[in-house]
Amino acid sequence: EYVAYVNAKASLGYDTVDEMKADARNYLESSKESSKKSAIRSAVMDKLGEVCTVKELPDGLLDARMEEVMAQYESYYCSDGSSLKDYVENTADQDYDEFVSNVTDEVTSDLKTQMILEAIAEKEGIEFDQDGFDSYVGNLMSNYSYSDESTLYKSYGLSADSGKEYLKKVYVCNMALQKVVDSATVEDEAGTE
């Protein structure tokens, strides 16, 4: 990753070795800070999973999300007309039923996390805001090289509309998670804050 970064910077050119070293230092510090933030978010998510309980998913929610996820897999991996079952059984180390079971477990976990974060958002008065969402969508498009919003939305749902609605929920959940992260007391492995 750093090699690609240096190559990109190299086309801009450095005037001195000190400039290159300073840029390398900045890159490493930024990378370290990003890793730290990611680790904190992950630890907060783990803790939320420990202390919060979702007794059951609303009727139809799992089925609807599974339909979307399986359609996404099929769209991504089966553009040649093959079935997802054939694709999984020919390329994965599991049979199709095992694959579906694993995906179901993952989607169930994701939905429970989503419900926990939606409850936090509601309790904290965190609401959807269009400007923030537009910025979020712009970042997704830039980071993952989507050419237009419709294509981005379609990659998250059965249609552009359902994908957009899903991303709106993800956006609000991310704001709720950030609120929890910002209020968390974080200690390193040595026990210092």
Name what the model sees in each region.
Residues 101-106:
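Conserved interaction-surface patches within small, structured recognition/assembly domains
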Residues 1-97, 108-193:
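Peptidyl-prolyl cis-trans isomerase
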